[in-house]
Structures are given as C-alpha cells and as structure tokens.
C-alpha cells in the first residue's frame, strides 16, 4: 500500500515517468525497421558450377558428386540438394536456423577449395556460391530494353556495369542476369568446306587459339629510357578472325573465312528474355538471408539514377517488379486496424463509465503502454511487421483491462462516498493482486512460445515478446499512473445513485439483473451445467481433429511466379514461341499489370515468369482466383504446361519447384526411383486434393546415343579423347579462346553451322584425323541411334532424388493434401527402398502439427503453475482454467463458420485466448476468495456476490478485448488473410466463453470448494483417529 501511495501522492514524478516511457517508445518507433514478417530466413547458400557442353549425367557424376562429398562434411547442414542440367550444376545447402550465414559461407568456401583437385580440368571457372535461397521470390526485377542495341550488348551492360554495382548494395545477395548472354565471336563451321579443304575441326580450334593470345612481351631499356613491348597478338572482333590461316593445301592457303562464317554474336544463342511484349534483359535481384526487404529495395531505388547514368541514352532501365508496395500497403492496413481498435476500446470504456474524465484515464494508459512497447522492440532487434503490429492491436484489449479493473474499483468506492485519494488508494490496494495475477498469468502463456526453436519459434517469438512487453508496461501504468489520475481527475464526481440507469447503463443494469436470475437457476441445476462443461471438453477434441489445417494463410501479395514446362525434346525456337504466347495471354487478363520472363540456358524446355497483379483495390479477384482463371484458360496449350503460384512471405526449404509444396522420393538405386516415380506421380495427379502435380524428374529428353567400336578405333589409330574432342568442337558451343577487354572477358565460340545440325545426317559429315594424319569418318568407328536421356539429374544428400511438386486447390487444405498423399503411398505398396518425405513448407507443417497440442498443453500447465504459486492453492487455478474449453469451442466453431482453416495464426489466437478468458475467472475467483476469507461468507454466497459485483468489469474487459480483435476479424485490403484468422479466433472464443463461463465458473468453484472441504474433513478425521 505504501508503494501505491507513493505514486498517488507524487503526481509530477508519476506523470514524468510515464512521459519518459512514451518518449523512449516514440524514439524506438522512428528507428524500427519495417518488414512483412519477423526474420525467419533459413541460412541458405547456393553453389553454381559449369562445364559447357557436358550432359546432365556427366555434370552429376564429375561435378556434383565430388562437391557434395566435400560440402556434406560441413556442420549444421539441414538439407543438401543438387540439380545437374546441361552444362551446369546447382547445389543448395539449407543450414540450421541458428547457423550464422557468414560462418556458413566461410565453411563452404573451404570445402570448395578442398574439392578443386577432384573437379574436371575443363571447367571455365571455379564453382561460385551465393548467400541466397533459390526458392525465394526476387525482391526486385529490373529490365534493360533498347531499340538500337542487340541483346548481347544489353547483357554486357547489365552484367558489366549494373550487376556488380547492385551486388555491392547492402542486403543484396545475388543479381542474376537472364534473357541473353555475353557478346562473343561465333565461328559457325561448314562441314562440306572443311572436307573439301582437308581441314579438321581441331585444326581450326588450334589455329584460332594460337592466333589470339595475350601474354607479357617484356621491355627494352637503356641508361635513359625504357620501352614496353606491345604487340597486336589479340583479336577482338569477328573481322579480325576471318583472315586467320587454318591450313595449307600444298601452296594454297585456307583461311577461316573459307570454311566458316564468323560473326559478332553471343556466347549462348539459346536464351531469350521478354518484358512488356518486347525483348529484354532481366536483372533478377535476391536479398541475403536476414536482410530487411524494404530497406534493401530502398537502397536499390536510391542507386537507380546513378545506374541510369552509366548506360547509353538509347537503353531503358525499368523496374519491372517490386515486392514492397503490397508490403507497405499491408502494414498500413494493420496500423489502421490498430487505430480503430484503440478508438473502439476507448468507446467501450466511455459507454460504461459515462464520464469524459473517467474515460480519459484508460485513454492515456493505452497509448502509454503501446508506445512504450516500441522501445523494447527496438532493443530486441525487432521490426514493425504484420505480426508485431497485430500483437499491439490485440494488446489494446489487454492493456485497457488492467486500467479498467483499477478504475472501476476506484469509481465504485467514490460512488460509495470516499474521497478520490482515499478511494484511489483503497481501490488499487484491493485489486492490485488481481491485476498482478491477470498480467503474470497472461505472460505465462507465452513462456512455452519463447522457448520454441525453429521457424515457428522465430515467428512466435517476436509476437510473444511484443505482447508481453505491452502487458508488462500496462501493469506498471495501471498500478501507478491510473490510480494517480483517478485521485486527481475524479474528485469532482459525486455519488449519483441512478446516474447509471440511463442509456447504455440501463442496458447493463438489466443484463446484470437477468444474469442474477439465470445464475440462481444455474445453481439449482448444477449437474446440467457440469454436463455442458464436460461436453465442451469433448467438442474441443472433435473440432480440433476434424478442423481443416494449413501451415500459414495463403497471402495475396499481388505477385505470381510462373513456370513453363514443355516437352523434353522441344527446340529452343519452339520454346520461345510458347513462352511468348503464354505471356501474351496472361498479360491480357484484366487483373494483370505486367509480365516479365525468360527461357533458355541449361534447361531449354523450361521458362520462368514474374507476374505483377493490379493493386488489390483495383481488382475484384484474389491472386488464387486469378491463378484458377489462368489455369483453365491456358490448359490446352499443346506440348507445354504452365504452373502458377502466389509469392508468399513465409516459405521453407531451398528447392526451386514449380508449385508451392513438395514431396521428395529418395532411393539408393536409381532404377527403383525411375520405376516408381511415374506411378506415384500419376496416382497423385488423380487426387482431387492436389492440383498442378509435376515432377523435376526429366528423363525423356531426345538423345543421339553414340557407341564407339574400340577395336576399330585402335586399328585406325584413333583414341576416345580425339573422338570426343571432335563432337565437342562440332556441337558443344565450345569456348576455344578468350578476348580480354577493359571491363570484361568474352569468348570465341566454335560449332558447326546451325543449318548442318538439323538432323542426324550431321554426324555423317564428321571426320577425325588419326595418328598418321589420315582423315577418318566418324561412321567408320561409331554407330548411333536415337534414345532417351535425362535433362536433369537430382540428388538429396548423396541419394538419387525426385521431387513431386503440387498446389492445393480451392476447397481443400494442406492437411487434406498430405493425408491423401500418405494414403496413396500406402495403397500403392511402395517398397522400403523408395522413401517418400515431405520437403520445404509441407515438412515444416508436419512438424508443426505434431507440436501444436504439446504447445497448448505446455501453456496451460505453465499458467496453472503460475496461478498455483500466486494463490498458494492446487484447486483455484483449476477453477480459473475451466474457462478454456468453452473458448476453444467458440474459436474452432468461428473458424468453421468463416470457412477459415486452422493455421499458425489461428494457433496464436488460441494461445491468446488461454490468457484472455481466464482474466474473467480471476476477477471473479479472486473476489470470492477475499469475500470468504474476510467477509466470513459461505462459498456459495461469496461466488454469487463476486459474480454480481464483478459483472460490470467482466463485461467491460471482455468487450474491450473483443473490440480490440474486431478490426482484425473484419479487416479487408492487403494482408487481410493474415489478420482475419487471429481476429476470428479471438472473437469467436470470447463470445462463447463469455456466454458459458459466467455460469460454469461459479459451479466449478463450488464443486472444487466441496472437494477441498471433504479433503480437509478427511484429514481432520484422520488426525482425530490417530490421536
């Protein structure tokens, strides 16, 4: 009591202390970064390696496997996957969440250095790594277009001038340049001319290589001067290469131009990018794990004017896609919901108190508590994001509860005739322990959340600490600032016995009278009330088990990612045409703003698209509805399939799949995997719970298989190396020389002219020189036949792997899809040699489902322990916790009513309800215990008196919490799909709990009091018997 008196008697100190809390919070608010969600990025490192012309199988065995063996020794790797395609290998390492990304990068570099001696000698460069997740959507896409410059020149500008500059910006991990390739001198050989001039392909390669060299020539000097020697040993343009002498036919000179067409072109002619219906080069920008997306994008935008100055006037640099507008809009909506919640809560207080002065007290306490929280958020390294702002919105109802309980009790004493200061001191002393119990037990709910690890723990941690801080500050304000303001602001109020019987006060009075009558009736039918209570326990179990579940609500970010998968034997030109048609059809949709995409590179049959939708306020359909419409519209494109998925802020794993969820098949025997994967994929494709079912297993690519007759080769004086060199020279786009320029390096690329590679007859024109200098046709020692070959080879760990990706159609949830997959695997009788595991988000969802009930139980046990310590009782905490089953039923029924699946956000709502609804029981039970102890009342008299006297503050606190959550439940606009499940859960739980616990709590209080008395009587009788 002395502590409370200190704050009441020193209003200046109390006011300034509260002002200091507010100022620190305001400063923290201005310094807080902004983000869509708490930082939950897994440390992911992606390694790239290339060997131009190598088949996927060659890349897998000679590049991927040695690297995997070295990288697999690194500590802290959760998952290692690799994908090898034509001429390239990509290895993705997903580390434990607690692994520092920079430490991981150092370990990766050391492993790459150690494996260098195991890699093929023909690799043009060492493997390189990026600290980015290939499965993440890019944060920004820039495009380069020009009416005067070709794609090779644009690509050169993008990679040489822009990509390096952007990569240096803080927060940027990787800048991928797509839609083309670097300029190059291309040598297109004519097999007929080579035959007629008796020139081999290797003669041409050696001649070009020896004619373009760059080596130091030294210098000459005397006593006075020094001269560096510089020669014209380097050739830079196609016109410089054409006169090269490649062979002598007796006295006749054969120049390169006699046997080939030499042009200034690009390294890889089989790559194309498009944006806005015109050719474009794309700069796809990804952020580093842990980097703030909005700050990173802001830094990039700040650099754009300088970047444009580096480009010729004829080149246009545009922002094709920016991830941040919808993030900013979503946060603005949450802030609006927070403001509405504060206003509604204060309105509730005013309706009950009917006094401007009295309403001013919680109207001050709420913002002080909320604003002060920002300082703690800043010190903890948090951000202003959807979850932290939702925590503050929900906290509005919590923080006002404490002020309401104190204010209402002080007001009651003033109405009974006490002076304001006396009423303030007496009132806060009476309910101080109640407020402390309410706050500490509410904080206890979040202790298990704070101890959680993994992605879910990271998501919950920021929410829990933000809410806990707001509750802690609210507790302090309610026991200091609130009684002080009551003592000084309420002094003009005089007792008015009937003042509360007008308007809203009259309604509450009638409700209280009605409650008194119905409570007496309930006390006469205790068994029925207990039966209802037990029924709610069973209903909770049924509703939870049968509830449709998902990992995280599907967000409408206004961004879609598109993946085109075509026939495995498709040509680049056909693939480019299909991409163009797909993009034109998508761009014509009424809700689509822009489409950017590219195809080519190592995967000729694949294309990628980045689609921006119109702002949510300008379209009538959600992102998923747009996807469904486009899926139907584009389903009949022959030879190609389009897969679309919405960009999400929460995505686990490192796989770049064609759909949102993945199911991976693993086998030690590749033949077993090839046998079962098509059967499983077909079965899953027929399930109604899945859509867009596809696999990364591509083993039906067209191949021309050559078989060497080694005996004949030996007789003819030809070795396998010579034969392979012939094929590489002819068909491998072989990079045979390097052109060194001031800002970059370019290649000289040699292959047979495209007109001679249209069919298998090209092999008949191939000749190799034997050891005697004789020209031997390829057909003399080799035979060939068409076959199938893999377009990609995939590993997980060191096992062969194939990932089946899928989306979930409307009307079903992720839990439905997972159950259907597991059921199908059992029905198919898949052997133990083929193992199926969920990956990425689906895997995290499975782990979360297993821990949800444990988490809820841990929260309940923690609250029980805290309440037991506070009340020094085993029984009273059970009475207080008896309010939870009805809240659970209300929450789960509300989710069903609004057709909302049970997700992590709904789980947060359930955890909050554990803290909210027990407040009413605490208010009731605490008063009854005091009345029994000090008023010498029976248990029934005490609980009836407590129920009636505390009816008004119970209704006030419930309505405050309900109206605090109502803006979330009724929210619309950007990010509403995140806010609604939380609001629905809280509002539904509060309504059902309020309806039932006003009756069940008194009955259960009396039940446990009877148990306590019988137990005490039994102990007493035992003592007497022993005496």
From Swiss-Prot:
It comes from the Bacteria. InterPro entries: AcrB_DN_DC_subdom, Acrflvin-R, Multidrug-R_MdtC. Keywords: Cell inner membrane, Cell membrane, Membrane, Transmembrane, Transmembrane helix, Transport. One of its GO terms (molecular function) is xenobiotic transmembrane transporter activity. SUPFAM superfamilies: Multidrug efflux transporter AcrB pore domain, PN1, PN2, PC1 and PC2 subdomains, Multidrug efflux transporter AcrB TolC docking domain, DN and DC subdomains, Multidrug efflux transporter AcrB transmembrane domain. It is a multi-pass membrane protein. GO terms for cellular component: plasma membrane. It is found in: Cell inner membrane. The chain crosses the membrane at residues 16-36, 333-353, 360-380, 387-407, 431-451, 463-483, 528-548, 853-873, 875-895, 897-917, 953-973, 984-1004. Pfam families: ACR_tran. Belongs to the resistance-nodulation-cell division (RND) (TC 2.A.6) family. MdtC subfamily. Part of a tripartite efflux system composed of MdtA, MdtB and MdtC. MdtC forms a heteromultimer with MdtB. This is Multidrug resistance protein MdtC. It comes from Proteus mirabilis (strain HI4320).
């Amino acid at each position: 009591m002395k502590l409370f008196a200190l704050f009441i008697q020193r209003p200046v100190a109390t006011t300034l202390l509260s002002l200091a809390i507010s100022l620190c919070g305001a400063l923290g608010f201005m310094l807080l970064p902004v983000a869509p969600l708490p930082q939950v990025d897994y440390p992911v490192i992606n390694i790239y390696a290339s060997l131009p012309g190598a088949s996927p199988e060659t890349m897998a065995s000679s590049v991927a496997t040695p690297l995997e063996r070295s990288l697999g020794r690194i500590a802290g790797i959760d998952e290692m996957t690799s994908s090898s395609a034509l001429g390239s290998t990509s290895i993705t390492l997903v580390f434990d969440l607690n692994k520092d990304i920079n430490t991981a990068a150092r370990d990766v570099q050391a492993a790459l250095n150690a494996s260098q001696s195991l890699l093929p000698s023909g690799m043009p460069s060492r493997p390189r790594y990026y600290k980015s997740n290939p499965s993440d959507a890019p944060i920004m896409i820039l495009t380069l277009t020009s009416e005067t410059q070709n794609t090779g020149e644009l690509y050169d500008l993008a990679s040489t001038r822009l990509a390096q500059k952007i990569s240096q910006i803080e927060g940027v991990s990787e800048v991928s340049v797509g839609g083309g390739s670097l300029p190059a001198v291309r040598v297109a050989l004519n097999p007929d001319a080579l035959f007629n001039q008796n020139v081999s392909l290797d003669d041409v390669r050696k001649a070009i290589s020896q004619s373009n060299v760059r080596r130091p020539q030294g210098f000459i000097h005397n006593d006075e001067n020094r001269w560096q020697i510089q020669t014209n040993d380097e050739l830079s343009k196609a016109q410089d290469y054409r006169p090269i002498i490649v062979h002598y036919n007796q006295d006749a000179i054969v120049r390169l131009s006699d046997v080939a067409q030499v042009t200034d072109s690009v390294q890889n002619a089989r790559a194309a990018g498009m944006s806005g219906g015109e050719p474009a080069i794309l700069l796809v920008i990804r952020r580093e794990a842990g980097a703030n997306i909005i700050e990173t994008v802001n830094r990039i935008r700040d650099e754009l004017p300088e970047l444009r100055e580096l480009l010729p006037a004829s080149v246009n640099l545009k922002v094709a896609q920016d991830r941040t507008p919808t993030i900013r809009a979503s946060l603005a909506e949450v802030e609006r919901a927070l403001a509405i919640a504060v206003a509604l809560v204060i309105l509730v207080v005013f309706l009950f108190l009917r006094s401007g002065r009295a309403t001013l007290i919680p109207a001050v306490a709420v913002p002080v508590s909320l604003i002060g929280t920002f300082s703690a958020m800043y010190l903890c390294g948090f951000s202003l994001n959807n979850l932290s702002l939702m925590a503050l919105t929900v906290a509005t109802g919590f923080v006002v509860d404490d002020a309401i309980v104190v204010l209402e009790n002080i007001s009651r004493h003033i109405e009974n005739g006490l002076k304001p200061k006396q009423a303030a001191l007496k009132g806060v002393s009476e309910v101080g322990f109640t407020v402390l119990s309410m706050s500490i037990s509410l904080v206890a709910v979040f202790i298990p959340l704070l101890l959680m690890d993994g992605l879910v723990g990271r998501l919950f941690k920021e929410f829990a600490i933000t809410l806990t801080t707001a509750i802690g500050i609210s507790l302090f304000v309610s026991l200091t600032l609130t009684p002080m303001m009551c003592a000084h602001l309420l002094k003009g109020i005089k007792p008015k016995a009937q003042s509360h019987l007008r308007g809203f006060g009259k309604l509450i009075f009638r409700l209280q009278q009605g409650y008194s009558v119905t409570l007496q009736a309930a006390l006469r039918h205790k068994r029925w009330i207990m039966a209802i209570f037990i029924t709610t326990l069973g209903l909770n179990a049924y509703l939870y088990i049968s509830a449709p579940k998902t990992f995280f609500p599907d967000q409408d970010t206004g961004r879609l990612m598109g993946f085109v998968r075509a026939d495995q034997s498709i040509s680049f030109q056909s693939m480019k045409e299909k991409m163009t048609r797909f993009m034109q059809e998508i761009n014509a949709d009424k809700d689509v703003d822009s489409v950017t995409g590219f195809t080519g590179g190592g995967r000729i049959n694949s294309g990628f698209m980045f689609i921006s939708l119109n702002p949510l306020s300008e379209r009538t359909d959600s992102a998923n509805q747009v996807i469904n419409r486009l899926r139907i519209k584009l389903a009949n494109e022959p030879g190609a399939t389009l897969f679309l998925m919405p960009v999400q802020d929460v995505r686990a794993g490192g796989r770049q799949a064609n759909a949102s969820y993945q199911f991976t098949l693993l086998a030690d025997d590749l033949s077993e995997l090839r046998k079962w994967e098509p059967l499983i994929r077909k079965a899953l494709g027929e399930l109604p719970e899945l859509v867009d079912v596809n696999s990364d297993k591509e083993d039906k690519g067209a191949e021309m298989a050559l078989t060497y007759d080694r005996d004949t080769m030996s007789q003819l004086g030809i070795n396998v190396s010579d034969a392979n060199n012939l094929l590489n020279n002819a068909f491998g786009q072989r990079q045979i020389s390097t052109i060194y320029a001031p800002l970059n390096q370019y290649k000289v690329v040699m292959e047979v002219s495209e007109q001679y590679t249209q069919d298998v007859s090209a092999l008949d024109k191939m000749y190799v020189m034997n050891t005697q200098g004789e020209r031997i046709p390829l057909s003399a020692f080799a035979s060939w036949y068409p076959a199938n070959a893999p377009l990609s080879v995939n590993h997980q760990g060191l096992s062969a792997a194939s990932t089946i990706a899928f989306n979930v159609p409307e009307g079903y949830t992720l839990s439905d899809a997972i159950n259907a997959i597991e059921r199908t695997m059992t029905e198919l009788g898949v052997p133990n040699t083929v193992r199926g595991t969920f990956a990425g988000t689906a895997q995290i969802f499975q782990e979360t489902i297993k821990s949800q009930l444990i988490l809820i139980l841990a929260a309940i046990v923690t609250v029980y322990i805290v309440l037991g310590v506070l009340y020094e009782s085993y029984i009273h905490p059970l009475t207080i916790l008896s309010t939870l089953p009805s809240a659970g039923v209300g929450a789960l029924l509300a989710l069903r009513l609004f057709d909302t699946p049970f997700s992590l956000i709904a789980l947060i709502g359930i955890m909050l309800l554990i803290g909210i609804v027990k407040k009413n029981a605490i208010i009731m039970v605490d008063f009854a215990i005091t009345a029994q102890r000090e008023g010498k009342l029976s248990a029934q008299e005490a609980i009836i008196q407590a129920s009636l006297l505390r009816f008004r503050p119970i209704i006030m606190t419930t309505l405050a919490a309900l109206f605090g959550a109502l803006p979330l439940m009724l929210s619309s606009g950007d990010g509403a799909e995140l806010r609604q499940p939380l609001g629905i859960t809280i509002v539904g739980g509060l309504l059902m709990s309020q309806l039932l616990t006003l009756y069940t709590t008194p009955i259960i209080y009396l039940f446990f009091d009877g148990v306590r008395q019988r137990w005490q009587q039994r102990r007493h009788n035992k003592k007497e018997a022993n005496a």
